[in-house]
């Protein structure tokens, strides 16, 4: 221990897939039942974690010197409307010490909050606000969970799969009123179904004599 910093004993460095596999074994063993499942793909470890254990899991990954995932990269949401718990909340971390990345996922629905991780990584503040704004995912314990990217009075959450492509409200600047106005969306034409055969792809013509070839 030097100046309060733990110094790891010198070990032979491990690189590539072997390093990821070794990290997976260590992390899964340490977190135990908090880990629902794990997988290694494209040189990165992904953990699916119980939502109630996300603060515990991130604290361990940050503080254990053998992990040292101290760079908080991002939080994002993913929407799977067909699932009962339709949302994944995905956390991305980086360890500069070990040159490794790790991804944690938790699942939730539209009404069940996920614990905020601001106490572990203060940088999560705006990421959680962005995820709430775009997906409607709630974070319990967040000090200021309000919209971040969309406009005042915005209806809905635009990255949900069931959000209409046109939105609900059009925001534009009105020259006559010299101010921004909000109006219901007015389409210049009705939606059309373009699910037909493209003229560029051609069609299957049956010409005289083709039946001999098929025979």
From Swiss-Prot:
Record-listed E.C. numbers: 7.1.1.-
Keywords linked to the UniProt accession: Cell inner membrane, Cell membrane, Membrane, NAD, Quinone, Translocase, Transport, Ubiquinone
Recorded catalytic activity of this chain's protein: a quinone + NADH + 5 H(+)(in) = a quinol + NAD(+) + 4 H(+)(out)
Subcellular location: Cell inner membrane
Similarity comment: family membership: Belongs to the complex I 30 kDa subunit family.
Cited function: NDH-1 shuttles electrons from NADH, via FMN and iron-sulfur (Fe-S) centers, to quinones in the respiratory chain. The immediate electron acceptor for the enzyme in this species is believed to be ubiquinone. Couples the redox reaction to proton translocation (for every two electrons transferred, four hydrogen ions are translocated across the cytoplasmic membrane), and thus conserves the redox energy in a proton gradient.
Protein name as catalogued: NADH-quinone oxidoreductase subunit C
Organism: Methylobacterium radiotolerans (strain ATCC 27329 / DSM 1819 / JCM 2831 / NBRC 15690 / NCIMB 10815 / 0-1)
Classification of source organism: Bacteria, Pseudomonadati, Pseudomonadota, Alphaproteobacteria, Hyphomicrobiales
Gene: nuoC
